[in-house]
Amino acid sequence: MKILVLNAGSSSQKSCLYEIQSEPSSQPPSPLWEGKVDWTHEQGYAEIEVKTSTGACLQEKIAADSRPIVISHLLATLWQGDTQVIDQPNEIAVVGHRVVHGGAEYRKSVFITAEVKAAIARLASFAPVHNPANLEGIEAVETLFGNIPQVAVFDTAFHAHLPLAAAIYPGPYEWYEQGIRRYGFHGISHRYCAERAAQLLDRDLSSLRLITCHLGNGCSLAAIQNGISIETTMGFTPMEGLMMGSRSGSIDPGILIHLLRHQGYSADKLDQVLNKQSGLLGVSGISADLRRIDQAIAAGNDRAKLALEIYIHRLQSAIGACLPHLGGLDALIFTAGVGENSATVRAATCAGFEYLNWQIDQDQNQPSAQDRDIATPDSAVRILVIHTQEDWAIAQDCWQLIQTNSQS
């Protein structure tokens, strides 16, 4: 069975094609085909990159007049040109989409219907950057592939069973009745990493108490017990929680009232500042990219040093806040761009917990230390670095839904 996965963002579109012969393996396979569109490098143009498992590559820049047309152009390289891996589109059995916000009603992956599309559009007010991009991908597939089955895999679904004490904000109860509650995000990544941790540790997932740290441009933690998310740092939107690349994370809401009343801020300006001009970028004045922050620190830049210190401080605080809900910890997991590649962040974070005997093996804590345990043998918890593979998790959900549907 060939499964196409689309992972749409506001500025990029990533896709890959998997082939699953039987039950999906525990080890993620290499995709037959991988494609990416990036709209950020030059205004009015999209950069397309494609590679296949046989080594064929394509790089091109095209006019970006219509995002759906660009997505269709990318997907057509599956059966056209040097990167062709299938003869015709109908060889693909199902298309899976990462959908950022599924609200309270979508607690698991579902086949996409008109009703599901309407819900994704309605929930765009909760995720205005991502849900519209997810819909673009869905509609591009409809245009290109016709009535092929499509599956929505929701980033919020893994957190759908948060205890009410963790899900409800301490405002008027009417907020909760209106859907204003904590949803959590990065759920596909948190779930994948929890399952992969159980494999690496040779333990049953239901026996593990885990904290997963998804640290990329967006950052969130999840406390996982019995394979279920019981606490997470993102909330109603992906702005809550940890300091991020360009997002502030949690701040005193009184600051926002002050800015609205006394600094002439509009809601749109607040949105721009909190989402695009804060976090590592806002404090350092340099970049949202931790690699550039590290370079500036090495050059003696004090604001870059302060930005990293705040980042670590808030990360340590969030990890500490998760511990009482788990009643202990079996493994701490680092994943995503920063989590997987920054040995500095991992070491600095765990240094705050040395009094609990969380010990990193410095020889194992290398930048490319993926899918391995980097804790010392006598550490009280295992410290894992896992390469998150959201696309493979989406493909697995598609396979499972197709199998279930065929048996019903």
Swiss-Prot record:
Residue positions binding ATP: 14, 214-218, 289-291, 337-341
Cofactor comment text: Mg(2+). Can also accept Mn(2+).
Localization, UniProt: Cytoplasm
Keyword Transcription regulation appears in the UniProt entry: no
E.C. code: 2.7.2.1
InterPro entries: Ac/propionate_kinase (IPR004372), Aliphatic_acid_kin_short-chain (IPR000890), Aliphatic_acid_kinase_CS (IPR023865), ATPase_NBD (IPR043129)
Gene Ontology BP annotations: acetate metabolic process; acetyl-CoA biosynthetic process
Cofactor: Mg(2+); Mn(2+)
Keywords assigned: ATP-binding, Cytoplasm, Kinase, Magnesium, Metal-binding, Nucleotide-binding, Transferase
GO MF term list: acetate kinase activity; ATP binding; magnesium ion binding
Binding site for Mg(2+): 7, 390
Site (Transition state stabilizer): 186, 247
Function statement: Catalyzes the formation of acetyl phosphate from acetate and ATP. Can also catalyze the reverse reaction.
Family label: Belongs to the acetokinase family.
Protein name according to UniProt: Acetate kinase
The gene coding this protein: ackA
